[in-house]
Amino acid sequence: MLKNIFNIQTETDFQQKCLETFRYQYENLEVYRKFVDYLNINPSEINEVEKIPFLPIEMFKNHLVLDKNSKAEDYFQSSGTTQMNRSKHYISDFGLYEESIYKSFEQFIGKPEDYIFLGLLPSYSENPHSSLIYMVDFLIEKSGKPENGYFLYNHQELFELLQNLKDKKVILFGVSFALLDFLDFCQSNSQTLKLSNSLTIIETGGMKGRKEEMTKDELLKILQNGFGTEKIYSEYSMTELLSQAYSLGENIYETPNWMRVLVRNTEDPFSYVENGKTGAINIIDLANIHSCSFIATQDLGKILSNFEVPRFGRNDNKQILNNKFQVLGRIDHSDIRGCSLLVV
């Protein structure tokens, strides 16, 4: 049951795997079982995904979210100051996270071995338990290119390297405020970016209080103009997840095959809104088998459409339901985190 989540082939497979995971986590994850029991829900009556209870993400701040059959190797910790009550996600199998990273990247962008990876991720680089840094480190390792590396505030060095790599396939992972700082540096020093179409910029994170907040669309437009590219990609994940959704432009995200977004009603957390309506994001992440695969986040968003996509690695015509969604901001009064956005 714990294996083969990356080989889900049909919508029936996905639904069955979700229900199996729910039953396993109810039986073996103490904090989740107590939550379900508190809601007075009979687990035997959960026979469809929409009925599965989603654990509030805040539980990762004050509880051990790890099943009783697992032993933690280490943990990821959310961004923030040392005075803040930060989330901890205890990890018992880093191989599961690495496979999720690889297959998700491969599905949406390509094989990591084909790219040079550069990281412009200050603040995250200073967090020894950052899941984002672990992800980029893993992609760098798989790439194996000598040009791979991180940049904190050495903008001139990054500028020169980007010019020298114009003929190479390059991925630049950048936290939002750092990408804006880099563009400010180029402008103030009259440095003109001459980049090739082989550069892919993947924006992630947020302003972290370093810049004036703006809408996602405003941010993407500034980055598009500054870097002279038609599309800015984005990555959406969080400390409490082992999977990532990607946007290939226009602030429209897609989930990998073992991950799904549902949008709940902010007035009634046990019901869901229609596609196109704004609500709070619930996330199914089947890679979280040893923690919790059903998480109610404090992010606002909306599902744009449901669609069928072919499974990679298969020659048949079987399809699986997936969704495109937008992330629109944070619920009022929720904690301000490094990945916060202004509601649009």
Language model region names:
Residues 83-91, 113-123, 144-148, 273-274:
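Short acidic, glycine/Ser/Thr-rich loop/turn "cap" segments at secondary-structure junctions
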Residues 75-85, 123, 176, 239-241:
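Ser/Thr-glycine-rich phosphate-binding loops at phosphate-binding pockets of nucleotides
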Residues 79, 88-96, 133-137:
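"Short basic amphipathic alpha-helical interaction patches in structured regions
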Residues 2-5, 9-24, 28-31, 114, ...:
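Active-site glycine/GP-rich loop and adjacent strand/helix microenvironment
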Residues 11, 16, 27-77, 84-90, ...:
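Active-site diphosphate/adenylate-binding microenvironment
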Residues 86-90, 128-131, 182-185:
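Short, conserved acidic/polar surface loops in the N-terminal third of protein domains
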Residues 108-136:
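Conserved AMP-binding loop of ANL adenylate-forming enzymes
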